[in-house]
Amino acid sequence: MRSKVTGAKRWVVKIGSALLTADGKGLDRGAMAVWVEQMVALREAGVELVLVSSGAVAAGMSQLGWTARPSAMNELQAAASIGQMRLVQAWESSFGEHGKHTAQILLTHDDLSDRKRYLNARSTLRTLVDLGVVPVINENDTVVTDEIRFGDNDTLAALVANLVEADLLVILTDRDGMFDADPRNNPEAQLIYEARADDPSLDAVAGGTGGALGRGGMQTKLRAARLAARSGAHTIIIGGRIERVLDRLKAGERLGTLLSPERGMLAARKQWLAGHLQTRGTLVLDAGAVQALRQANKSLLPVGVKTVQGSFRRGEMVVCVGPDGLEVARGLANYSALEAQKIIGQSSDAIESLLGYSAEPELVHRDNLVLV
């Protein structure tokens, strides 16, 4: 199983705030230098590398003399805008000492939910990687709002793994990996060395929240692994305080928790659909429609929908749930919520008489639908 790590040719490495700062007192340049040494060694071993770096808010807080992470959005954005300058300068300086170039890329969810911008970001990232440059990626905290934020850099790293079709996502954290119980409360807790990313039993052991400086707890890391699995990537959740951890991973040492995709890589468009985090409404399906989606790879027809919830326009993302309320799929609606209300439960042949026109016979076409 660890051959999936040692043989991986393209890595996305996510480093959290706690591993880049000196107890919240600004950037730890010494720690960053050690990370860079290991990443340069990976590059020289032929590994293509993308870095997703937290730390902008923490660096800005230190510069402003703040000791506690603010909750107000405008204060967070102010800290991020100050800290991002210092963060990128630190990475550029450290990589430059080894003759390596870096590039800053700031992303928002809007960048990846728009198909044209998504493809442009993918093209830019792949070009940088092909040139041997190390892209340093962060969320654009200065302009993002609660409604369109990724929520944490674990999720962003997973979507970047999809963008560049990475073989491996490495999420470095302040824990040694995922445990079968909370090691802070249970001394008998055992590290989970390998599992399938979609294993439902992992949800029960992934509770908890992030640290004081960061946003992502173990649950977000598990969700990130599942997102990355959509593009066929393996994910390692591993302790960033383990000495020379990246070197040791590359050497095949059995460290951290390796989460593997069960299914093969989704097609590129399906990866883009799976990466949509913001949904506008919900379609409640009957059992027959659920079966048609899951077993026959069919489009979603109006006749199979029982209820429409929320407000959405044509082309916006909706969640499809079964009679039990569990999510089955998500996709882009061919009709608005108001139009969908009028045609659900009806044959596609009746759409024109009900609406006065017929855009498509499907409520969600299978090409715009991804199973979850």
Curated annotation (Swiss-Prot):
Sequence positions that bind ATP: 14, 173-174
Keywords for the protein's UniProt record, in alphabetical order: Amino-acid biosynthesis, ATP-binding, Cytoplasm, Kinase, Nucleotide-binding, Proline biosynthesis, Transferase
GO cellular component: cytosol
Function of the molecule: Catalyzes the transfer of a phosphate group to glutamate to form L-glutamate 5-phosphate.
GO annotation terms (biological process): L-proline biosynthetic process
Protein name: Glutamate 5-kinase
Record pathway: Amino-acid biosynthesis; L-proline biosynthesis; L-glutamate 5-semialdehyde from L-glutamate: step 1/2
Gene3D superfamilies xref list: Acetylglutamate kinase-like (3.40.1160.10), PUA domain (2.30.130.10)
Binding of substrate, residues: 54, 141, 153
InterPro entries for this protein: AceGlu_kinase-like_sf (IPR036393), Asp/Glu/Uridylate_kinase (IPR001048), G5K_ProB (IPR041739), Glu/AcGlu_kinase (IPR001057), Glu_5kinase (IPR011529), Glu_5kinase/COase_Synthase (IPR005715), Glutamate_5-kinase_CS (IPR019797), PUA (IPR002478)
Domain (PUA): residue spans on this chain: 280-358
Catalytic activity: L-glutamate + ATP = L-glutamyl 5-phosphate + ADP
Domain of life: Bacteria
Top-level EC class: transferase
Molecular function GO labels: ATP binding; glutamate 5-kinase activity; RNA binding
EC number in record: 2.7.2.11
Organism ancestry: Bacteria, Pseudomonadati, Pseudomonadota, Gammaproteobacteria, Pseudomonadales
Compartments, record wording: Cytoplasm
CDD domains according to UniProt: AAK_G5K_ProB, PUA_G5K
Family: Belongs to the glutamate 5-kinase family.
Organism, as annotated: Pseudomonas putida (strain W619)
